[in-house]
Amino acid sequence: RAVESRFRSAKAAVEAALAARARSREAAVWNTLAAKERLCEEFDALVRTAGDPPQDAATAGTDERWSTLPPLPPAWEQRMLARRDAALHALADHAAAAGYASRMERGMESRAEILLELELSLGLESPAELHAQRLALQVKQLRRRFQDAATPGGGPAGERLLAWCAEPGIADARDRRRCERVFAAIEKAGRTT
């Protein structure tokens, strides 16, 4: 009986250690995604405020800063690299900068909706001034469910957060706080792709 009890205790300890390690790895993925998104946002801000390219001083060490961060899962890394590379190309080419800035403007609405979807799916509060949009989004999601249609842009919260991170744009202070709350909630919930 004592041997069986020790075995169960040891097994429980190993399972707890493995679970803690898995949570730590998941947290590292979310932290890396957040860091890469912030780095991309820095470049987006430079595109928005840039005079004439090139912005060599501002982008110096980009590869080094990026490479100091651990890699994301391959599909995620590709999407974030695409955002980073598009911003760097816009910083190096004036014609590309105008197109990229226009893309950021067009993506503002999409980013706002994704952030609202994330708050809704994670049960987080939205700012009071966004309650009308949140209600409209809830109605839209209910309508989709009742029509039994595929949910375009739906999917797990992690995938929606990746979509938000991969979309060019600059979050204001309020949206940055909201995004950080989303990252924290996903990390806490242990949601992965």
Region locations from a protein language model:
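Coiled-coil/CHCH-like alpha-helical segments characteristic
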Residues: R1-T193
